[in-house]
Amino acid sequence: MINKNDIVADVVTDYPKAADIFRSVGIDFCCGGQVSIEAASLEKKNVDLNELLQRLNDVEQTNTPGSLNPKFLNVSSLIQYIQAAYHEPLREEFKNLTPYVTKLSKVHGPNHPYLVELKETYDTFKNGMLEHMQKEDDVDFPKLIKYEQGEVVDDINTVIDDLVSDHIATGQLLVKMSDLTSSYEPPIEACGTWRLVYQRLKALEVLTHEHVHLENHVLFKKVS
């Protein structure tokens, strides 16, 4: 039974589908997830705590037995999962989405300056994530695997602290893009490209939140 004192991030770790419920009411389960459900709900307007708990417990009861929960993977298997489920899809989506973001800014930016700022923020987000993921793959993840195998990694805490700091900066850029787009709600006059960009940026936000949560609250806890 999920209760009001349970930590938001822990609930998502145990029941990954709970992320959808927290997201629907604007509760951060990612970098800001180390608070109780009650505390998180009090920060949001129009969130009924009892209703939220009911929805969360419905998810708990319908959790599919035998379905993969990454928290049960060891460090090396979890890293492989993260790379396959998040790193590669994110790289592919950045490659495919960037031309549309550029086109939207170029065509509609002169009359809607916030679209120019959106592109600049997206570029910062994209470049930062690509660099971050490459460093994880090449440098940081191998250190975590060595640590799991019993080798001495003197800077393991620094590695984790630096990655968490990167994640916080990433979260701030996601908030900025959401604010610039009114939570990815296109205006009535929006063309097809405009709507496509907003839709895919929103999906990118969801994917990134899940990605960061898995690293911050599952992977890093296994080595700290």
From Swiss-Prot:
What's this protein's family per the entry? Belongs to the RIC family. ScdA subfamily.
What PANTHER family does its record include?
Answer: IRON-SULFUR CLUSTER REPAIR PROTEIN YTFE (PTHR36438:SF1)
Q: Name the Gene Ontology molecular function terms of this record.
A: metal ion binding
Q: Name one Pfam family in it.
A: Hemerythrin
Q: Where in the cell is it found?
A: Cytoplasm
Sorted alphabetically, the keyword list is: Cytoplasm, Iron, Metal-binding, Stress response
Hey, what's the signal peptide range on this chain? none
- Name the record gives this protein: Iron-sulfur cluster repair protein ScdA
Q: Is DNA damage given among the entry's keywords?
A: no
> InterPro entries per the record?
Hemerythrin-like, RIC_family, ScdA, ScdA-like_N_sf
Q: Which GO terms describe its biological process?
A: protein repair; response to nitrosative stress; response to oxidative stress
Asked if the keyword Glycoprotein belongs to this entry, the reply reads: no
Summarize the subunit comment: Homodimer.
Gene3D superfamilies documented for this protein: nmb1532 protein domain like (1.20.120.520), SP0561-like (1.10.3910.10)
Task: Give an example GO cellular component term for this record.
Answer: cytoplasm
Task: Please describe what this protein does.
Answer: Di-iron-containing protein involved in the repair of iron-sulfur clusters damaged by oxidative and nitrosative stress conditions.
HAMAP family, alphabetically?
Answer: RIC_ScdA
